[in-house]
């Protein structure tokens, strides 16, 4: 689809690709609309496994990669409000179930990855910018306090939504405000207080997409900032299975406990189910050893939860987002 000329998506017409595989449903539009024009790329039956770290799971009924903010909001305004919408970043903290994801998956591209320095300690960052890019930009600008983002394998949109954190800091420590594209097609600017942050949670509604965030740090020396970022990178390399098909941290830390320690004490280090395995290097990470299905991975996680509860009476809560339908 051309990125220059708007192309109508009509509910009564099925793209040719829909005849292959299971087929996507016709895209449902808002009452009174006969089509919705997009300038980005919209793909039916889009495989999601290549886009997520586990390399498993089904397809998106529709994958929409908007050209820019106006393209995204125009699409939302034309879409039936009952059609589910989900944002996808780097796919690092997600299990896509084997039956695929109904509705629309929105993936923000380069147009949403821009970063602008507002003043000596403040950056405006697009929702598609990675944690590595944000922290590196802050380092080069002499802005301290954002180093921990080097340890979050995701995008601004994702870690703002979930109050992502690493190495003792969280997004709520640096966020000034976020711009959120709501399912209605309107865009709102939310100050920090409105996000209602708690541990790995925010009040961003389902179907909304975080398209921009403003972060504030403090004056710092680029060399010292870089040294801290390097230390974070080394610590991750030494303690986490980074070069594997993994989804990152699997379970939230219960109050007063480390999830990995509970998992280890329950005898789950190295536990396998099919080609899914609890990492021996860091047992709060699950691995796809090659041919694991998302069903294998999720079932292994549930077995870990069962064993931890049986031995400690503590219920681990999933940190990884699990989306879509079982096959």
Question: What role is predicted for each listed range?
Answer:
Residues 81, 88-90, 174, 244-245, ...:
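Short, basic and Ser/Thr-rich N-terminal targeting/leader segments
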Residues 94, 135-138, 146-150, 163-170, ...:
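A generic local secondary-structure boundary/capping motif
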Residues 33-156, 166:
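Anion-binding (especially nucleotide phosphate/pyrophosphate-binding) glycine-rich loop
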Residues 1-37:
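Intrinsic disorder/low-complexity segments
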Residues 49, 67-70, 110, 129, ...:
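Conserved active-site and cofactor/substrate-binding residues in soluble primary-metabolism enzymes
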Residues 64-69, 95-113, 160-191, 205-212:
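Structural signature of FAD isoalloxazine-binding scaffolds in flavoprotein oxidoreductases
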Residues 55, 107, 124-126, 147, ...:
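Conserved beta-strand segments that form the floor/walls of ligand-binding pockets within enzyme
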Residues 43-44, 94, 181-327:
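Phosphate/pyrophosphate- and phosphate-bearing ligand-binding catalytic cores of soluble enzymes
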């Amino acid at each position: 689809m051309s990125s220059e000329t708007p192309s109508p998506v009509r509910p009564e017409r099925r793209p040719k690709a829909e005849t292959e595989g299971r087929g996507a449903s016709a895209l449902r539009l808002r009452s009174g609309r006969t089509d919705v024009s997009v300038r980005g790329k919209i793909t039916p039956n889009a495989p999601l496994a290549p886009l997520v770290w586990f390399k498993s799971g089904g397809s998106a009924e529709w994958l929409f990669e908007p050209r820019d903010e106006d393209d995204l909001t125009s699409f939302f305004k034309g879409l039936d409000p009952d059609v589910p919408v989900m944002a996808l970043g780097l796919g690092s903290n997600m299990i896509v179930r084997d039956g695929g994801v109904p509705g629309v998956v929105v993936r923000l591209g380069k147009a949403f990855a821009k970063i602008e320095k507002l003043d000596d300690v403040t950056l405006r960052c697009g929702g598609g910018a990675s944690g590595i890019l944000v922290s590196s930009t802050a380092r080069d600008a002499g802005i301290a306090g954002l180093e921990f983002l080097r340890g979050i394998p995701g995008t601004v949109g994702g870690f703002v939504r979930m109050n992502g954190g690493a190495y003792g800091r969280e997004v709520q420590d640096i966020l000034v405000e976020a711009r959120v594209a709501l399912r209605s097609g309107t865009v709102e600017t939310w100050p920090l207080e409105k996000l209602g942050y708690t541990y790995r949670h925010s009040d961003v509604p389902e179907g909304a997409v975080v398209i921009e965030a403003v972060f504030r740090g403090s004056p710092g020396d680029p060399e010292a900032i870089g040294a801290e970022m390097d230390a974070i990178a080394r610590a991750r390399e030494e303690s986490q299975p980074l070069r594997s098909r993994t989804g990152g941290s699997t379970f939230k830390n219960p109050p007063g406990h480390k999830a990995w320690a509970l998992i280890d004490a329950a005898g789950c280090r190295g536990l396998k189910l099919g080609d899914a395995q609890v990492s021996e290097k860091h047992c709060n990470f699950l691995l796809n050893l090659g041919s694991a299905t998302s069903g294998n991975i999720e079932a292994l996680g549930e077995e870990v939860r069962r064993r931890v509860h049986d031995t400690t009476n503590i219920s681990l809560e999933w940190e990884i987002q699990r989306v879509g339908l079982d096959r």
